[in-house]
Amino acid sequence: GKSFYKEGKHDSIIAIGGGSGMDGGKAISLIANNSENLWDFEYEKSPIKKLSSFPPLICIPTTAGTGAETESTAMVTNSELGMKLCVWHPKQKPITALLDPCLTVSLPKNLTAWTGTDALVHGIEAFCVDSLYSVADGMALQGLNLIGNNLLEVYKNPDNLNARGAM
């Protein structure tokens, strides 16, 4: 990805897809303008202080569930270690997320159910964590309400754009 970015003289990155596609875009963004190895950005390590700026990153999700379009973290497989690692930098986040329910209409029913359940779990996690801000609990409850009112509907009627948009 980095060589494609450099050779094309691109000035930004657009990541489209599910969580893995967007995580791939975030990983490329971390190293696109920097000489560091991707694994230098591992979450368990202290953030690198002297870096070139990260290219603007736009995320376009095609599923409802991971929330990857809102986060700076990315899960990437390290083939040498045979495991997934979390990479990130606090100054690298998507500048915008473009949400278009039309992009989820062709999602197979099983993926609609799986990613919708993933969104449900994220909402439960957010509500159950000790929150410093009561607004976070309100947002979690609103998310759970939207999922409860729309997940079964999009599973049964994949073309329902209102329900897809609510997911």
Model-derived regions, located:
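N-terminal small/polar loop signature for handling phosphorylated ligands or for N-terminal nucleophile
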Residues: 1-37, 153-164
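Short alpha-helical scaffold segments that flank and stabilize functional sites
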Residues: 3-4, 27-28, 32, 122, ...
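Short, surface-exposed, charge-dense and proline/glycine-enriched linear segments
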Residues: 12-24, 44-51, 75, 89-91, ...
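Generic hydrophobic secondary-structure packing signal
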Residues: 21-23, 112, 119, 136-139, ...
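Active-site segments that bind and position negatively charged phosphate/pyrophosphate groups
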Residues: 126-167
